[in-house]
Structure formats: C-alpha cells, structure tokens
C-alpha cells in the first residue's frame, strides 16, 4: 500500500523538486554493505565494503554481554544464547554467515579507523534491563573516545531511554531516534539531532520531513531498498536513506 501511494504521488507530479546532490553523501549502508560475495551483515568486511563504494556511512548494531564485552550483532541472541545474559566466552567462537567471528566493538572501531572519514552509524540495541543499556552506552562511549572516533560516530536507537542517556552523557554527540512515535518538535525538545524513521512513518506524516528541517533536525529513512521509493524520499528532501542497496542508491 505504501508503495502504491508513492507511485501515485509520482504520477500526480506532487513530489517536491530537489536540487541535484551528491547522492553518495546521503546513503547509509544498513548493517554495512553485506550484499556482496564473501560478506555478512555487521561484519568487518561489510564495513570495509561500505568504505570502498564511497557512501556517507555504515550502520551497525551493538549489545553488551553480562561480563561487559560490547559486540557488533543485530539480533539479541546468537544461536539461542541471549547476549545480554551471556558471558563473552559463550559466544566468542560463533561465526557469521561468511565465517567471520562476531566482532567486538573494539575490533570494529580499529578497522573503522583505517577507513578515511566514513561515518559510523551506531545503533544501541534495546536491552531487557535499562541498566544494561546504560552499561552498553558507557562502554561504547569510552571505546569510541579512546579510538579517536567521536567526530565520526553518530548514535541511533529505538530505546528512548538509550537516546536520552547518550544526550545526557555525551551532549556533543549526534543522536537520532528510531521508534517513530515522536513528532519532530518532540524530538527537538528531547535534545536529539534528528529523526530516523521507518518509511511508513513519513508516509503517515507527510509534513514531518519539512517540519524537521525547519527545526534544524536531520532526517533519515529506513530500510528502503526499492529504487523508486528511494528516489521518492530524495525528492522529498530527506537527508539520508538507510538501505541494503547502497551502491544502487548512490547511483540515483
């Protein structure tokens, strides 16, 4: 239904015109550029692949183990082992689909340091215990700062608690909220730098991109893989598109 709406908008000619832009600077690779031979989601190779195609940034996810190791992984469990309740030793030998080990955040950041000025879009995953989110953020901020990557790292989360905690403890950091239940004004009042919402949220609230821009917020949309839909959001003035097709999006 949402794509039908977009196609109708295109046919009616009501899409807002936009000036020509360098699309590469507007594209974020979702969990890295993993749709290539020999790579996998949230792997170090997917991070390196993102750099090779020259887009704005590489998105990835972090959790913290019971014994304090921050790992880069999307799901909250690894082969049925709940990351939040496990020690790192319980998952350290598990492999991604391409055979790589699940990266520690420290390893991921070390690889990122070698990749020019590409942005790191770091998602703090929701944890069952908010105290574990706090532990995850504290450890993450420490590692990012020690790696000298604070100016290249932007933070996102579905957890309002996590976003608020980052704003409080790293007020110079760019934080965008993912959950889609705050208006641009509410996000601004919370101290966030932007809104990073699913495509359907912007379809349901067509004025939010413009409102966010007027408030000085950045806007991102996820996870959009249909090229017509990506083009629609570019024409609407979205700042960034998070996609599993970063190389194709860059070429639009």
Show where each model-derived region lies:
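Bacterial Sec-dependent N-terminal signal peptides
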Residues: 1-24
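Phosphate-group recognition and catalysis centered on beta-loop-alpha active-site segments
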Residues: 16-252
